[in-house]
Amino acid sequence: MNIIEGKLQLIGDERIAIISSRFNHLITDRLVEGAKDCFVRHGGRDDLLDLVLVPGAYEIPFALQKILSQGEYDGICCLGAVIRGSTPHFDYVSAEATKGIANVTLKYGAPVTFGVLTTDSIEQAIERAGTKVGNKGFEAMASLIELINLYRKIGA
C-alpha cells in the first residue's frame, strides 16, 4: 500500500493568507501569532504571508470566496473565535461560518483550514489560544502546510 501525505515543510515560495475575525480580538490576535509562528518555523517567508481582517467569524466565508476567486494564494488559514453567550446567536454564527467555509473550500478545491474556535466560555478560548491546550492558530497553519504539500502530490 502506498501512503500519500503532505509534509510539514514549505519550499519558501508559498503565498498564504490568514483570514481572521476581529471580534474577540484578544483571542484571535493570539491565534494569528500562532499561525504566523508556524508559517515561519516551517520555511515560510514573512513577506509572502498576508493577514485579512474581517469583522467577525460570520464574514470569513465572504472574504474566503473573494480571495480564492482571485487565485493568488497557495492556501488560506481561517481563524476566529465564537464564544457561547446567553442567546442563540452563538449557534447561528458558528454554524454559518462553518458551513460557509466548507462550501467555499469545496467550490474552489483549494487548500483551506478551519481554525475558528467555538467554545462555551472565554476560559476555553484562552486555553486554545496559546495556554493550556496549545495554540489552535499554530495547529491550523500546520494543517494548511501539510494540505498544500498533499495537494501538490495528488496532482491538483
From Swiss-Prot:
EC number(s) on file? 2.5.1.78
Q: What is the lineage of its organism?
A: Bacteria, Pseudomonadati, Campylobacterota, Epsilonproteobacteria, Campylobacterales
Against PANTHER family, the record matches this protein to: 6,7-DIMETHYL-8-RIBITYLLUMAZINE SYNTHASE (PTHR21058:SF0), 6,7-DIMETHYL-8-RIBITYLLUMAZINE SYNTHASE DMRL SYNTHASE LUMAZINE SYNTHASE (PTHR21058)
Function field: Catalyzes the formation of 6,7-dimethyl-8-ribityllumazine by condensation of 5-amino-6-(D-ribitylamino)uracil with 3,4-dihydroxy-2-butanone 4-phosphate. This is the penultimate step in the biosynthesis of riboflavin.
Q: Which SUPFAM superfamilies match?
A: Lumazine synthase
Q: Identify the species of origin.
A: Helicobacter hepaticus (strain ATCC 51449 / 3B1)
- Report the InterPro entries cross-referenced here: LS, LS/RS, LS/RS_sf
Annotated active site residues, numbered on this chain, are H89 (proton donor)
- The residues that hold 5-amino-6-(D-ribitylamino)uracil are F23, A57, Y58, E59, A81, V82, I83, F114
Give the binding site residues for (2S)-2-hydroxy-3-oxobutyl phosphate: S86, T87, R128
Write the protein's name: 6,7-dimethyl-8-ribityllumazine synthase
Q: Which family does it belong to?
A: Belongs to the DMRL synthase family.
Any GO BP: riboflavin biosynthetic process
What top-level branch of life does the organism fall under?
Answer: Bacteria
Query: Could you give one GO CC term from the UniProt record?
Result: riboflavin synthase complex
Q: Which GO terms describe its molecular function?
A: 6,7-dimethyl-8-ribityllumazine synthase activity
Reaction catalysis annotation: (2S)-2-hydroxy-3-oxobutyl phosphate + 5-amino-6-(D-ribitylamino)uracil = 6,7-dimethyl-8-(1-D-ribityl)lumazine + phosphate + 2 H2O + H(+)
Entries under NCBIfam families matching the protein:
lumazine-synth
